[in-house]
């Protein structure tokens, strides 16, 4: 399921990283971009050569193309959800990771089609819930977190329902927004972009069991 260079190596890179990290008392999480298929010609060709799901690129129920060589898995598809969950379980069952971490790409501009914002959030939320439950059913000590976009409005528009993830059980253990801007933002360097974004996230309703990291 995983495209890698393992077959050409005499060792498993992820396994070795976990061993090295744990020896030094460092926790290690597997960072996953759940929906992304390809970003350019090279990654597209790799997917077509190595993936068992290459036929999905010809099926709009399973994938969405939004530019030349750029595809994501269709978040609306149950087959896609099952495939992503199987990949997560493969990691959790075979490696001593301390957590699973999702990147900020869910829907992408150009992939919305006829969906509403609410439908996009519902489709993504089904995956998030199922991933959380799958992880906890295998090992309740493994955490599940997401790094949504630093721009809250973009998150919601692209299907990342951060409000629900923060305030309801069964979605995530933490979120870590990708706030990459400084407090010297803009042409005049006077916009407090980092502080403004962090304060926005900190102001969202959140249950105590869900952590917010910056």
Predicted segments with their positions:
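Active-site-adjacent "subsite" loops/lids of carbohydrate-active enzymes
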Residues: 5-19, 29-30, 35-94
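Aromatic-lined carbohydrate-recognition surfaces of secreted/lumenal glycan-active proteins
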Residues: 22, 26-39, 88, 101-109, ...
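Substrate-binding cleft/loops of secretory-pathway carbohydrate-active enzymes
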Residues: 39, 143-185, 190
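Short, acidic/polar
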Residues: 78-91, 154-169, 194
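Generic structural signal for well-ordered alpha-helices
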Residues: 14-18, 88-92, 121, 125-133, ...
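Hydrophobic residues within beta-strands of alpha/beta enzymes
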Residues: 1, 98-103, 175
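Surface-exposed substrate-engagement region within the catalytic domains
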Residues: 168-171, 183-214
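The substrate-binding groove and active-site-proximal loops of carbohydrate-active enzymes
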Residues: 2-10, 67-82, 115-123, 178-189
């Amino acid at each position: 399921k995983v495209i890698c260079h393992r077959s050409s190596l005499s060792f498993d890179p992820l396994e070795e990283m976990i061993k090295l990290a744990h020896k030094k008392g460092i926790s290690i999480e597997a960072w996953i971009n759940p929906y992304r298929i390809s970003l350019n010609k090279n990654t597209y060709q790799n997917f077509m050569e190595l993936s068992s799901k290459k036929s999905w690129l010809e099926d709009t129920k399973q994938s969405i193309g939004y530019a030349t060589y750029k595809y994501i898995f269709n978040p609306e598809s149950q087959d896609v959800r099952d495939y992503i969950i199987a990949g997560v379980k493969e990691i959790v069952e075979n490696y001593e990771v301390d957590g699973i971490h999702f990147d900020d790409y869910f829907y992408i501009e150009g992939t919305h089609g006829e969906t509403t914002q609410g439908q996009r959030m519902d489709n993504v939320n089904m995956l998030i819930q199922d991933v959380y439950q799958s992880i906890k059913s295998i090992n309740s000590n493994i955490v599940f977190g997401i790094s949504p976009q630093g721009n809250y409005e973009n998150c919601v528009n692209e299907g990342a329902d951060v409000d629900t993830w923060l305030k309801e059980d069964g979605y995530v253990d933490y979120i870590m927004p990708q706030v990459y801007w400084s407090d010297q933002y803009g042409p005049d360097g006077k916009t407090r972009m980092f502080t403004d974004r962090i304060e926005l996230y900190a102001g969202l309703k959140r249950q105590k069991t869900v952590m917010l990291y910056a």
